[in-house]
C-alpha cells in the first residue's frame, strides 16, 4: 500500500483529485489543492526594479509576481478577467513590502498591450523586466477538430501577444533589462492533443532566440522557461476530471510541479545572476530529458 502525503512538492505520487472548470484560463481559488505559489527565501536580487508580468494573476504568473516582489521588485500584473485571483495576488505582493498594480484586459489585442505598458510606466516611471507569460490551451483529439476560431485565439493569445507587448515595451527597456518568455515542454516533444498550443510554444522558442540576437548589442537579455506539468488553473479549465486525476504522473518524478518550483527560474533569468545568458531556456519539467 502506498503512503499518501499532503505536499505535492515532497511526494512522488499524484495528489490531484478529479476536477474540471468550464472557463479559461481558470480560477485558482477553485482548485483543490490550491497551488503553492510562495517561495521562502529572498535575496533582494531585483531591488528597485520594475517588472511587468502578463498572466500574473494565478499559476506560474502569480508565483513569478510573488518571487519578484520578495526580491525587491515592484510589479505590474496583467491578467484577463480573473479579478478575485488578481486581487489576492496584489494583496500578497503588498504583504511582501512591494508595490503592485492590476491591469485587466486581453493581451491578444495590440492596443491593449500598448495600454498595459503605458500604465506600468505611468505608475512606476520605468520598466526593467518583461515576463511574457499569458497563455491558453484547448485540447483536441484530432487536427480536424481545431476550428479556425480556436487556432486564431490560441496563436493570438500565446504568441501574437508577445510580439505586441514586447514592441510596446522596447522603447522603455535599456541596457541591463531582461525579457523572459514562457514556453513549454511541448515545444520540444510536441503534444498529440495540444497541436496548436505546442505550435505556439515552439514559435515562442524561435521568437526568444531570434530576439535575443537582435537585442544583444543593446544589452537587453532575452531568455525563456519551458515548464513541464505544473499545477495551475489552466489544467482543470482545459482537461476532463479523468485527465486531471492523471496529471503529472508520466514524468520521472511522478508528480506535477508547483508554481513556486518554477518561479526561481524567472528570478534567475531576470537578475544579474544570469548576466552571461541570452537566447537560452530553462527546463523545470520533473526530469523529462529533452533535446534543447
Give the role of each language-model region.
Residues 6, 11-16, 31, 38, ...:
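Short C-terminal tail/terminal secondary-structure segment
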Residues 10, 114, 122, 137-152, ...:
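Conserved mid-core segment of classical short-chain dehydrogenase/reductases
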Residues 124, 163, 172, 255-284, ...:
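C-terminal substrate-recognition "lid" of short-chain dehydrogenase/reductases
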Residues 144-163, 180, 204, 253:
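Catalytic Tyr-X3-Lys loop
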Residues 166, 200, 208:
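Active-site helix of classical SDR
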Residues 171, 213-217, 275:
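Alpha-helical segment proximal to the catalytic Tyr-Lys
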Residues 184:
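Residue(s) in the substrate-gating loop at a strand-loop-helix junction
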Residues 193, 217, 229-251, 291-292:
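A glycine/serine/threonine-rich, flexible loop-to-helix segment
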